[in-house]
Amino acid sequence: IWLPIQFDEQGVPFIEWTDEVNLSAQSEWKQVWSDEFNTDGLPDTTVWNYDNGFARNEEAQWYQKGNAYCKDGKLIIEARKEKGRKNPWYEAGSNDWRKKREFIEYTSSCITTAGKKEFLYGRFEVRAKIPVSGGAWPAIWALGSGMEWPSCGEIDIMEYYRIKGEPHILANAAWGTDWQWNAKWNSKAIPFTHFTDKDPAWADKFHIWRMDWDETAIKIYLDDELLNEIPLSETVNGTIGKGTNPFRMPQYLLLNLALGGINGGEIDDKGILMRYEIDYVRVYQK
């Protein structure tokens, strides 16, 4: 057995475990894909798709391609306030929330790897700086393909929004039940003060969200702090999903900045230009 022996300034030997153990653990993982966002302009269209329009959760923003762009080695997703822009889906008298809005008040972007990059198990790392203004709902997440939500499975590596007016960071997973579009959740909501009490400048900095996912569990970390551990033994779909386990099937990635809706809350839109910055997305497997 090789021991990590080092010597102090007096030449006395000692064993320093921490760095070596971390190095050994990291060396088990091999990077299989990444996007470093190093080319200015639109994100790589061979990897990323774009949501278009009003998408989900009665959110306020209209998703469009132009609000996501790469600059200076980062992906920028911007939420912008619009003025007098007509909703092309508008139908007077409609009960559909997507169609009954006459105007588009806000725009943003959601990019996904659906149909282009899917992964089964691995370590997923995203280094990002998130907006924390009122109404902001940034996310790093994953979905399965081939089944309706939630039987396809959803993993929320990161969500930020307000719960009863107080900001939280969330780490979740959802899967199917016996009722269509009804999910079972394993969710952890950590008060934002848990982070800002330690570092008042937390929101001004980049942080690393990580998911370690194998055939036994999903573990979600923020700056190496474990936020949630979800055993795959509990994530079995109900009858709608035919008893399958969505987290033993491939998932694709999504990055988005939503506003308002059922979770985002009241939007602080004074001169709004919210910016969600992603330094990189990296995927490792053993």
Where do the model's predicted regions map?
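GH16 jelly-roll
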Residues: V21-K286
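Beta-propeller fold recognition
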Residues: I1-E28
